[in-house]
């Protein structure tokens, strides 16, 4: 289980996370939704120790990673896999080298076993016999799947997905959604997904959490979020142009324009 308590982070005068509270149950996929610039990516970076928050706790199975030194953090990070928004493949490496990158860097297995793991993980995401292709030869959906194969290559028990369906057509987005569900069911990973794609969120989530003004303002199952009575959440999930989110933005613009 991941327990985030009182998490705060600011950049200069801008408060991004403001006493955020969130519990991520073990073996479940918690999807964090929210508008652009609301701090979703900052939350994930804090969760893996890439950003140090100003206050709060992030406990993974009871251990607070914020108070760990760098050596302890390196050990904990081995439990994480991450699918980046743009897949973040190394352009100078072929597909096989990309998937094997962490395994070789951490010297996890003998070379023969690394090759077997690469083949296995690529098969899990529906890609066979493409190890020698370069990233430039892949479609957007293939890049995402290679990125996912790399994320699971080290057998993590926690997976982080940063906007996994962004930039994909609806069919390929649904392929990625199905892979996320399959991984949760077959290897039992605990997952945090950040997205503003509500179709994806409703399909893959066990729980959905809405991030707004640096706080989680509502957590619920997909059905509970669909029928929310919170006007902020309701405006966001229904994609309405008018409501408290946009009304507040318009009021701010009028104020600074005086």
Q: Can you describe what each PLM-predicted range is?
A:
Residues 134-138, 142:
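Conserved ABC ATPase signature
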